[in-house]
A protein has these predicted regions:
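Glycine/tyrosine- and acidic-biased, solvent-exposed loop/turn segments at the edges of beta-strands
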Residues: 1-119
């Protein structure tokens, strides 16, 4: 664990045989969770999560064992409502990208193939 000068926790990092393994959490100076990342044998895997100072979820970023973005990246408004959903394959946009207003209504929808917009 690492701490800020004010005594609040700055980060918690799990190691296995001197290599990051498990959940790593980073906090702001007020002790609020900012980022949560899972590691397996030194590589980021699973869904990386970022948080607003309020504690509400800001972003979900799915990573594979190679550290590439694979899956649906979700970004949220500070209210907690979904702002956008972007489908990725091997770090490139692939499939549907949807954007929403704060009421939940879809404001735009685009389609991508291999990182290129097709519609």
């Amino acid at each position: 664990k690492m701490y800020y000068l004010n005594g609040n926790i700055q980060s918690e990092i799990s190691y296995k045989k001197d290599v990051r393994d498990g959940i790593t959490r980073t906090y702001d100076p007020n002790g609020k969770l900012k980022v949560e990342v899972s590691y397996q044998n030194g590589v980021q895997v699973g869904v990386q999560k970022g948080y607003y100072p309020s504690g509400k979820l800001k972003i979900e970023l799915p990573l594979d064992k190679n550290g590439l973005t694979n899956g649906i990246v979700k970004i949220y408004y500070p209210s907690g409502k979904i702002m956008s959903e972007k489908s990725y394959k091997d770090d490139k946009l692939e499939g549907t990208v949807k954007k929403y207003d704060e009421s939940g209504k879809i404001t735009s929808e685009e389609f991508f193939k291999n990182g290129n917009r097709i519609k």
